[in-house]
Regions:
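Conserved alpha-helix/loop element of class I SAM-dependent methyltransferases that forms part
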Residues: 1-9
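Class I SAM-dependent methyltransferase SAM/SAH-binding core
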Residues: 13, 19-56
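A short SAM/SAH-binding and catalytic strip from SAM-dependent methyltransferases
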Residues: 67-81
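Conserved beta-strand signature within the Rossmann-like core of class I S-adenosyl-L-methionine
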Residues: 92-99
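Short alpha-helix
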Residues: 113-127
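Core SAM-dependent methyltransferase catalytic element
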Residues: 138-163
Length: 163
């Protein structure tokens, strides 16, 4: 999570947290982290876990809440994209990375419903300030075609970038 350093405060929402690797990393930085997943609970100091299926039509479990950071990796449920935009507080950072079309050459996911179209994250988060965007083949940890974006709710001049 190369851009995690741009998250300067909590609370941070880890969507589809899986084993909790990102939640743990962010909690180690001192942030209050809310991890949500339909699977087994994630635990650790600074981590609150909410068990929820985000795809079954239930209401968004965090209605009215805003987050200083939102992290989503290896997960795509398109109806959540505008909800994530609404859930990001002023000055907040959203980091999203998942597979895109072309990944079927390397393995799963291969169903187009679970693969982003070229530039799709740019479109989905166009109301926010783009800090960084990448799409293409990654070699590690396993070869895959991915798309990743880091966006900010606020002016671009408030982000410190590396030279």
């Amino acid at each position: 999570m190369r851009w995690a350093r741009l998250i300067e405060r909590g609370p941070v929402l880890d969507v589809a947290s899986g084993s909790g690797r990102h939640a743990a990393l962010l909690a180690e930085r001192g942030f209050a982290v809310l991890a949500v997943d339909k699977g087994d609970p994630v635990s650790g100091p600074g981590i609150e876990f909410v068990k929820a299926n985000l795809e079954d039509g239930s209401p968004w479990p965090f209605a009215g809440r805003r987050f200083a950071g939102i992290v989503v990796t290896n997960y795509l449920h398109r109806p959540l994209l505008p909800i994530l935009v609404e859930s990001l507080e002023e000055g907040g950072v959203l980091i999203y990375e998942t597979f895109m079309l072309g990944n079927e050459r390397y393995g799963r996911p291969s169903n187009p419903h679970f693969l982003l179209r070229p530039g799709e994250l740019l479109e989905a988060f166009s109301a926010l300030t783009i800090v960084a965007f990448e799409q293409g083949v990654q070699e590690r940890p396993k070869k895959a075609v991915v798309q990743r974006i880091c966006v900010l709710r606020g002016p671009a001049g408030s982000v410190k970038i590396d030279p």
